Regions:
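ABC-fold ATPase nucleotide-binding domain signature/coupling loops
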Residues: 122, 462-495, 504, 517, ...
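Transmembrane helix-loop-helix hairpins at lipid-water interfaces of multipass membrane proteins
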Residues: 22-78, 156-189, 267-270, 276-283, ...
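Helix-to-loop junction immediately C-terminal to a conserved catalytic motif
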Residues: 393-394
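ABC ATPase nucleotide-binding domain helical subdomain, centered on the C-loop/LSGGQ "ABC signature"
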Residues: 403-405, 420, 438-482, 526-527, ...
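Extended non-transmembrane interhelical loops and adjacent amphipathic helices
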Residues: 1-8, 91-137, 199-242, 314-327, ...
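Membrane-integrated ABC transporters
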Residues: 1-35, 55-63, 82, 86, ...
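Cytosolic ends of transmembrane helices, especially the final helix of ABC transmembrane type-1 domains
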Residues: 224, 268, 289-325
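C-terminal portion of ABC ATPase nucleotide-binding domains
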Residues: 471, 527, 544, 549-593
Length: 593
């Protein structure tokens, strides 16, 4: 069976994490298997003393009781220790597998991340390591918990079968039919897993939105509370309907197993009473057999429900996780070359590109060159391909046709990490990471403090940072640090630009990096960046044209092609589309007297 193969592989990973895992499971199996059988002897022994009391009956009963209590204490203590150790190893295994998953995602081609197709393909894989309830931990924990119960059921079933073979056969049939009922109920969940995952994502979204500080203002000012709560209730109702269907299916499918169990218990009771009457079973054995029957039913229900849900049902998530870890389809990085040294020229040669799952060509047979140390501006309306050129240049996406060259070398020939070293990129969306200010400037674990300070000064943040105590060593996330360093949106934008200043790369790319700054502040930033572009090939993108006057050349894109090209002065004299764009925006760059 498929889940047996998956469980075997997961156990192998757990044992590689900690070889003592074998001992923990072995002890749990031995103790769990024999404990119920041994403890069922207690009433038999006590009744035996009562029937033949002698002069020291009370002492013997106390000794028997004490012995069994001590035995139970030891068994429970060792079992609890083994269970805790299994749980510890299971979580260690989960974290190691989670680390492998993250490595896989980090090296996946950007196209899988950008449209979340990787999460559609492998959504269940992330559920396998997302918590310590199900998935990896659930399978290992419940296997260690149900394996000894199954062994115990075999032993108890053997004792019962020795007395009544028909009862033993019916109990086996009961276990099979009840397991089938549970399997069908779980199948209801598995068959609708995609829809359930979608609903779970919606529930998580509403939970996050309700407590999100950034959403709090609009929720209150626009009175969105009722709308959000109604939507949340609808999602919860959908989730409840799936659970209700599973419960109803379990009930219907379980009726046959319940009927078989009643018949088995009736036959066993009849056989036991007859054996008691003819003297082949004494009073103590009578109580022991009753105890064993009760234990069998309770243990069987628990083992089947837990095993079916936590082991079999969770297998699909763990299988998906292993599929993700094994696939080689997510990365097309097969480059072998190291980064280029010195100045770099760029060439787009007959490049055509459409984003995944679309037919619209964003770039259509586009060709242009950027000389070493030249600075160009890419301008045009939204959707004309400016940011797409950057995405292709840094190999986040790959052209459908044509090639992109650095110093005459196709970018596909470079190792991914070596290619990235050649670019200092600042994008419109600023991400602040839960590390220190120094780490967020350098984007490295260790950094040059003086170099970081110069970068901050170059983007005009020196005075703001000097207001803070130990600013460069302060974490920038309130989620991990109480005294986190907090910057405004515009200041975060400047911090992002300081990363490009800090990084020693031959190609500088600024894709709408001043979107959160006003026009005059943007002009000042670009004026400073103009002083820093020496010995760098630079590409500027901005809807606002504050940067274009500093560029050696301007490329205006329209319809996936170059519509206008030239210096600022040349295009202004041409009085074409660039002239109109710049003239309309010009008033925003003029300071008031």
């Amino acid at each position: 069976m498929k889940y047996t193969k998956t469980l075997k592989r997961l156990l192998g990973d757990a044992i590689r994490t900690d070889r003592k895992m074998i001992l923990y499971i072995l002890f749990a199996c031995l103790l769990g298997a024999f404990a119920p059988l041994v403890l069922s002897l207690m009433p038999k022994l006590i009744v035996g003393v009562v029937e033949n009391p002698g002069t020291d009956a009370i002492r013997r009963i106390l000794l028997i009781s004490l012995g069994f209590f001590v035995l139970e204490f030891l068994v429970e203590g060792v079992s609890l220790y083994c269970s805790n150790q299994v749980l510890t190893v299971a979580n260690k295994t989960r974290f190691e597998l989670m680390h492998e998953q993250n490595k896989k995602i980090a090296t996946a081609d950007f196209k899988y991340i950008s449209d979340r197709s990787i999460f559609k393909m492998y959504g269940m894989a992330f559920e396998a390591t997302s918590g310590d309830w199900g998935g990896v931990v659930g399978m290992l924990r419940e296997f260690a918990r149900t394996a000894p119960i199954i062994l115990s059921l075999i032993l108890i079933g053997g004792v019962i079968t020795a007395l009544s073979p028909l009862t033993g056969l019916l109990l086996l049939l009961y276990a099979i039919t009840y397991a089938y009922a549970q399997r069908q109920a779980n199948k209801e969940v598995i068959d609708n897993d995609a829809e359930i995952n979608k609903i779970s994502d919606e529930i998580r979204y509403y939970n996050k939105t309700a407590g999100d500080f950034k959403s709090g203002k609009e929720i209150r000012l626009f009175n969105l509370k009722d709308m959000i709560l109604n939507a949340y209730k609808n999602v919860i109702d959908k989730r409840k309907s799936f659970s209700l269907r599973a419960v109803n299916k379990t009930f219907r499918k379980s009726l046959l197993s319940v009927l078989i169990l009643i018949i088995a218990q009736g036959i066993f009771a009849y056989t036991l009473i007859l054996s008691f009457k003819n003297g082949s079973v004494d009073t103590g054995s009578f109580l022991m057999y009753l105890t064993l029957m009760l234990q069998f039913v309770l243990l069987a229900d628990r083992a089947i429900e837990d095993y079916e849900f936590f082991v079999v049902n969770q297998t699909i998530y763990v299988e998906n996780m292993y599929d993700l870890l094994e696939t080689d389809k997510l990365s097309s990085d097969h480059g072998t070359r190291d980064r280029l040294s010195g100045a770099v020229d760029i060439e787009f040669r007959n490049v055509t590109f459409a984003y995944p799952n679309t037919d619209k060509k964003v770039l259509d047979n586009l060709s242009f060159k950027i000389a070493k140390n030249e600075t160009i501006a890419l301008v045009g309306n939204n959707g004309e391909g400016k940011s797409t050129i950057i995405n292709l240049l840094v190999r986040l996406f790959r052209p459908d046709e044509g090639e992109i060259l650095l110093n005459g070398v196709n970018i596909n020939e470079f190792k991914e990490e070596e290619l990235y070293k050649m670019f200092a990129c600042i994008f419109q969306q600023v991400n602040i990471y839960p590390y220190t200010l120094g780490n967020n400037i350098s984007m490295q674990e260790t950094y040059d403090l003086e170099r970081a300070k110069r970068a901050i000064e170059d983007v005009g943040l020196k005075e703001r940072i000097e207001e803070e105590k130990n600013a460069y060593e302060r974490n920038m996330s309130h989620e991990v640090a109480k005294d986190a360093l907090e910057l405004s949106g515009g200041q975060e934008q400047k911090l992002a630009i300081s990363r490009a200043v800090y990084k020693d790369s031959p190609i500088l790319i600024l894709d709408e990096p001043t979107a959160n700054l006003d026009a005059l502040a943007e002009h000042e930033i670009y004026s400073k960046l103009n002083d820093l572009r020496e010995d760098r090939t630079s590409i500027y993108i901005s809807h606002r044209l504050s940067s274009t006057k500093f560029c050696d050349r301007i490329i205006l894109l329209k319809g996936g092609k170059i519509f206008e090209e030239g210096t600022h002065d040349e295009l202004m004299k041409k009085k074409g589309e660039y002239y109109e764009m710049f003239t309309i925006q010009g008033k925003y760059y003029t300071k008031e007297a």
